[in-house]
Amino acid sequence: MERIVIALAIISVVKGDQICIGYHANNSTKQVDTIMEKNVTVTYAQDILEKEHNGKLCSLKGVRPLILKDCSVAGWLLGNPMCDEFLNVPEWSYIVEKDNPTNGLCYPGDFNDYEELKHLMSSTNHIEKIRIIPRNSWSEHNASSGVSSSCPYNGRSSFYRNVVWLIKKNNSYPTIKRTYNNTNVEDLLILWGIHHPADAAEQTRLYKNSNTYVSVGTSTLNQRSIPEIATRPKVNGQNGRIEFFWTILRPNHAISFESNGNFIAPEYAYKIVKKGDSAIMRSELEYGNCDTKCQTPVGAINSSMPFHNVHPLTIGECPKYVKSNKLVLATGPRNVPQRRKKRGLFGAKAGFIEGGWQGMVDGWYGYHHSNEQGSGYAADKESTHKAIDGITNKVNSIIDKMNTQFEAVGKEFNNLERRIENLNKQMEDGFLDVWTYNAELLVLMENERTLDFHDSNVKNLYDKVRLQLRDNAKELGNGCFEFYHKCDNECMESVRNGTYDYPQYSEESRLNREEIDGVKLESMGTYQILSIYSTVASSLALAIMVAGLSFWMCSNGSLQCRICI
C-alpha cells in the first residue's frame, strides 16, 4: 500500500518555479527567403525592391524636362513649322520624344549622323539659338521662295524655320562663298543641307546650274557633296529629298560654305550653353507637375530602396534595376508557432525554443517566469538593442553600397548598326541578369545570417542562464529551467541581470534534488514489483484459458487427444 501511495505521489508532483528564454512574436505575415528555406514568416522585414511609380513625367531636381510632344529631335532643331513652340526652349533636365513622332523631317530625306546628334543632345541641358547668317543677306539668291507643301503652316507652304532653301534669282545662281567665325565662348551646333532633285528639269528650274556641289570646311571637316538626281517614290507628295548635316564649331574657329546650287543654308545655330547629365527618353506620357530624383519612361520613382523593377531605362539618381519580383531583408526573428530543430547554414543552433511570445512587446529576446507570486514577461533590452543596432547598420550598409547614382538610358543606332545594337542589347541583358542574380543571392545569404543571428542571440541568453543556475535547476528541453528551490521575483530578477547567487540556493536545491531522486528510485522498485506480479498473473490466467479450451474441444470431438508411451 505504501508503495502505491509513493507512485501516486510521483505522478502528482507539483511543478516548481520556472524561468524560460524566448523571443518576441507578433501578428506579422511578412515572409522572406533564405538559402535554406522559402517563405519564412518573420516578425519584421524590410523591402528593398521598389515596384511603384507615379505614372507621370516629372521635373528632375526642380528642372523641367523638354517634352517634344509630336515633334522629333530633328523637327525641333531644324524648326519644323509644326514645332514652333520649341523655337526657343529653357534649360531642361532631360528630353522626351515619342516612339513615332509625326513632326520630324517634313520634307522627306535623311539626317546624316542623326544618332550621334541625339547622343550630343543627351549630354546637353541647354542650348541657345543665335542667328549666324541672316536671311536678308542673300541678296543674289532667292531666300524666300524655298518652301514646300510638305511643310505646311496655316494652310500654306512653308519650310524649316532655322535653315534657308536658296534658289535661283533672276534666272541666276552665283557661286556662294560664305565664312562664319565663332566668336562665342561656347561650342556652336551648325546645321545645313543639300537638295537632291527628282529630275534634271527640277534641277535647272530651281538652281539654273546643272552640275552643282555643296562644299563645307572647318579646321576638322572637309566635305564636298554632289546632288544625286534620281527618280524616287513620292513621300509627303515629294519625289525629291533633302539630306541634312551638322557639325560642332569650336570657339574662335571658322566654317566656310561654297556652293553653286542645291544648298540649304543655315540661318540659325545653337550655342551649347550647358552640358550635363541629360538623356533622350522615349515616352508617351505628359508632364505631371511633379518633381523627382529618378525618372523612367513609365513614371517617376521616389524611393530610397537600392533596387527597383519598374523599367530598365532610367534617368537621375535611381536604384539599380533588377528583374526580381521580391527582395525582402529579414530584420526580426522568425514568427512561427513551432520551430523545427535544425542547425542553420552559418552554424547557429536553432530549435530549442518551442515558440515565440506575443506577450513580450518591448524586446526581441527575453524571459518568462512563473512562481508563487505569479508570472510575467521581461525583455532583455541589452541584447535586443545590440541586435537592432547591428541589423540596422547592416541594412543601411547594404542600401548605401547599392543605392548609388545610376542611370541607364537607351542608345541610338542607325540601320547599318543593327548587329551592334543587338549585341548591345545582349550585353545589357547579361548585365541585368548578373545584377539580378547578385541581388537575390545577397538577400538570401543576409536573411540566412540574420535568422541565425537571432537564434544565436537566444541561445546565448539560454547559456547565460544555464551557466548561472548549474545544478540548482533542471533543463526542461524547451528553453525553460525548473528550479530545485523557491525562486521569488527578486531571485528571478537576479537570474535575468546575471547576479544570481548560486551558493545561496545550492543547499536547498541539493536537498530537494535528492528527495526527488529518492522518490524516483523507490517508485522504480515499486514499479518493478508491480510489473512482476502483473506478468505472473496474466501468464497464469492465459494457461487456465488454454487448458479449459482444450478440455472442451476434446469432450465434443473437435480435438483428439492421444497419449503415446
From Swiss-Prot:
Lipid-conjugated positions (S-palmitoyl cysteine): C554, C561, C564
Its membrane topology: Single-pass type I membrane protein
Annotated Pfam families: Hemagglutinin (PF00509)
Subcellular location: Virion membrane; Host apical cell membrane
Modified how: Palmitoylated. In natural infection, inactive HA is matured into HA1 and HA2 outside the cell by one or more trypsin-like, arginine-specific endoprotease secreted by the bronchial epithelial cells. One identified protease that may be involved in this process is secreted in lungs by club cells.
Annotated site, Cleavage, chain positions: R343, G344
Keyword Glycoprotein appears in the UniProt entry: yes
Coiled coil feature spans: none
InterPro entries: Capsid_hemagglutn, Hemagglutn_HA1_a/b_dom_sf, Hemagglutn_influenz_A, Hemagglutn_influenz_A/B
GO cellular component, one term: virion membrane
Ranges of the Extracellular topological domain: 17-528
Residues that span the membrane, as ranges: 529-549
Gene3D superfamilies xrefs: 3.90.20.10, 3.90.209.20, Hemagglutinin Chain A, Domain 2
GO molecular function annotations of the record: host cell surface receptor binding
Cytoplasmic side: 550-565
Signal peptide: 1-16
UniProt GO BP: clathrin-dependent endocytosis of virus by host cell; fusion of virus membrane with host endosome membrane; fusion of virus membrane with host plasma membrane; viral budding from plasma membrane; virion attachment to host cell
Disulfide bonds: C20-C480, C58-C290, C71-C83, C106-C151, C294-C318, C487-C491
Keywords: Clathrin- and caveolin-independent endocytosis of virus by host, Clathrin-mediated endocytosis of virus by host, Disulfide bond, Fusion of virus membrane with host endosomal membrane, Fusion of virus membrane with host membrane, Glycoprotein, Hemagglutinin, Host cell membrane, Host membrane, Host-virus interaction, Lipoprotein, Membrane, Palmitate, Signal, Transmembrane, Transmembrane helix, Viral attachment to host cell, Viral envelope protein, Viral penetration into host cytoplasm, Virion, Virus endocytosis by host, Virus entry into host cell
Residues the record marks as carrying a glycan: N26, N27, N39, N142, N170, N181, N302, N497
Note: Major glycoprotein, comprises over 80% of the envelope proteins present in virus particle. The extent of infection into host organism is determined by HA. Influenza viruses bud from the apical surface of polarized epithelial cells (e.g. bronchial epithelial cells) into lumen of lungs and are therefore usually pneumotropic. The reason is that HA is cleaved by tryptase clara which is restricted to lungs. However, HAs of H5 and H7 pantropic avian viruses subtypes can be cleaved by furin and subtilisin-type enzymes, allowing the virus to grow in other organs than lungs.
Quaternary structure, from the entry: Homotrimer of disulfide-linked HA1-HA2.
Family: Belongs to the influenza viruses hemagglutinin family.
Its biological purpose: Binds to sialic acid-containing receptors on the cell surface, bringing about the attachment of the virus particle to the cell. This attachment induces virion internalization of about two third of the virus particles through clathrin-dependent endocytosis and about one third through a clathrin- and caveolin-independent pathway. Plays a major role in the determination of host range restriction and virulence. Class I viral fusion protein. Binds to sialic acid-containing receptors on the cell surface, bringing about the attachment of the virus particle to the cell. This attachment induces virion internalization either through clathrin-dependent endocytosis or through clathrin- and caveolin-independent pathway. Plays a major role in the determination of host range restriction and virulence. Class I viral fusion protein. Responsible for penetration of the virus into the cell cytoplasm by mediating the fusion of the membrane of the endocytosed virus particle with the endosomal membrane.
Protein name from the UniProt record: Hemagglutinin
Annotated organism of origin: Influenza A virus (strain A/Turkey/Ontario/7732/1966 H5N9)
